[in-house]
Design a protein with these regions (language model features):
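An amphipathic alpha-helix adjacent to DNA-recognition modules
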Residues: 23-34, 38, 43-47, 52-55, ...
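Conserved acidic
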Residues: 17, 21, 25, 94, ...
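C-terminal peripheral helix-coil segments that are non-catalytic and often amphipathic
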Residues: 2-10, 171-200
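Secondary-structure edge/capping motif, primarily at the C-terminal ends of alpha-helices
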Residues: 86-90, 113-117, 144, 172-176, ...
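Amphipathic alpha-helical packing segments from all-alpha helical-bundle domains
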Residues: 101, 122-147, 152-167, 193, ...
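Basic/polar phosphate-binding segments, predominantly the helix-turn-helix DNA-binding elements
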Residues: 9, 13-22, 51-72, 105-108, ...
């Protein structure tokens, strides 16, 4: 099941079966919206404009999406799915290794995302994005003694890790990704090391 469905964004929508052709059609709409977001805020964009940019029809649009917000969520979901797959398939073995892959992914896309965020500043770093970042937890939880935590403690631990990562990511983007992915990964990993040393 795709993460988009898991988060309930497609619940109740009239989605067409996601065959290979269906996925390609769906992708046309998300890419069309991405193009428009580089010049306009989402509040200014209409379904008609998305349809025209995708060279499609409203009838086809509503087979896959219920609204422009639905397309926006799908675009964000696709982006984080791609990042997740990159990290998941990496050869990293440490938290810092995974962070290098994570920050490298986003830096490669900075120019395009920066253009979008000039008109939609809160699009990339929001509750949806934070929810997606939490998907990395099974990949990295073995790096810490999380078995010592009860259910509530583990939930707070995830909030600590991924809430912090989301804010660091947002700050890095706001500063134009001036630091390299390797430097960013080291900074974040070093913060964790300092925290652990303070306990000893």
């Amino acid at each position: 099941m795709r993460a988009l469905d898991t988060l309930g964004f497609m619940a109740g929508s009239k989605t067409a079966p996601l065959t290979e052709r269906g996925l390609a059609t769906r992708k046309k709409f998300t890419l069309a919206l991405a193009d428009l977001l580089c010049s306009y805020s989402v509040s200014e964009i209409t379904v008609k404009e998305i349809v025209v940019r995708a060279h499609s029809t409203r009838q086809t649009f509503y087979r896959y999406f219920t609204s422009k917000e639905d397309v926006l969520h799908a675009l964000l979901a696709d982006l984080y799915d791609e990042c997740y797959d990159r990290v998941l398939n990496s050869s990293g073995t440490t938290f810092e290794d995974y962070l290098v892959v994570y920050f490298s992914f986003w830096r490669e896309r900075y120019s395009r995302l920066h253009a979008i965020m000039q008109h939609n500043p809160h699009w990339l770093f929001n509750e949806v994005a934070y929810t997606y970042n939490r998907r990395f937890y099974p990949k990295i939880k073995g790096l810490w003694a999380t078995e010592l935590l009860d259910e509530r403690g583990e939930q707070y631990f995830q909030n600590f890790i991924f809430g912090g990562l989301s804010h660091v990511h947002a700050t890095w983007f706001a500063q134009g990704c001036a630091q390299s992915p390797e430097d960013m990964a080291h900074y974040v990993a070093q913060c964790w090391t300092i925290y652990k040393q303070s306990e000893e």
